């Protein structure tokens, strides 16, 4: 784990492939620095939860990695390739290896769910209309939406259905890497828990690497393999939940050991104890 007292980068095990590698990243809006020499690794096959206080730049980092926000300086490698050194054609190929679920879904309101899912397919320019229809229906089924949702417009969907439709679009080209920006935001507790379960199932079934920006403690506890925390423009700690709970940084202590964090941690420990007793 990394923290302020020990600023070195967490060393990956020999068998862990680094899918996203960020080094000494600086991002600024005007004279305001948002990222100040940020370092981060995301490993193949893991679910990484990325947390931080409001306005700290969690979504900005995700959008910078995606190339939607310009960086001032620093290195961003995706699948072992320096993003800055890719040609336009190489960049398009790399971009097809990931999918994105933006905050609030970001579906095109004038398109049906089917058409939204097909958008990434159309951009490739070599998938037939018939195959796009078949694939769109498969993606709908994959995220747990009924076939009847295909021809609905976003305004006709519930919040949970919008999230699932947006996830289906993110999975349209069978990506290796999925970016999720606050996927459970706006969902009720039951809907959020169901969406967490869906993400975990898809990650396991499809072998996805997941980069998830979130503030949802339930998601962090239930589906994340590792957590990285952002404060003061840097990753102040990165590691599994046990290490995050032991970190002495003031923000992390307030986040994980506050009233809600302590209550959730206690409930999960109680559940684990009951499960262990049930196996005896």
Feature locations, PLM:
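Conserved ABC ATPase signature
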Residues: 153-157, 161
């Amino acid at each position: 784990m990394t923290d302020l007292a020990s600023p070195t980068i967490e060393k990956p095990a020999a068998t862990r492939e680094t899918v996203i590698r960020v080094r000494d990243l600086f991002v600024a809006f005007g004279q305001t620095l948002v990222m100040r020499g940020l370092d981060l690794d995301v490993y193949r096959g893991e679910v990484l939860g990325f947390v931080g206080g409001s306005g700290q730049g969690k979504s900005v980092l995700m959008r910078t990695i995606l190339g939607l926000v310009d960086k001032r300086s620093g290195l961003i490698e995706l699948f072992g390739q320096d993003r800055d050194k890719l040609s336009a054609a190489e960049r398009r190929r790399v971009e097809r290896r990931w999918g994105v679920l933006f905050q609030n879904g970001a579906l095109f309101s004038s398109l049906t769910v089917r058409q939204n899912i097909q958008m990434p397919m159309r951009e490739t320019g070599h998938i037939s209309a018939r195959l796009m229809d078949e694939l769109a229906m498969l993606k709908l089924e994959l995220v747990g939406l009924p076939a009847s949702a295909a021809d609905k417009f976003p305004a006709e969907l519930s919040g949970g259905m919008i999230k699932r439709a947006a996830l289906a679009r993110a999975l349209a080209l069978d990506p290796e890497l999925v970016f999720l920006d606050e996927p459970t935001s706006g969902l009720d507790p039951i809907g959020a828990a169901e969406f967490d379960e869906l993400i975990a199932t898809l990650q396991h079934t499809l072998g996805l690497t997941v980069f998830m920006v979130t503030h949802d403690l339930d998601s962090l506890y239930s589906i994340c393999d590792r957590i990285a925390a952002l404060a003061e423009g840097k990753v102040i700690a990165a590691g599994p939940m046990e290490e995050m709970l032991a970190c002495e940084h003031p923000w992390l202590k307030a986040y994980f050991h506050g009233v809600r964090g302590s209550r959730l941690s206690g409930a999960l420990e109680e559940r684990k104890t009951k499960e262990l007793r049930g196996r005896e």
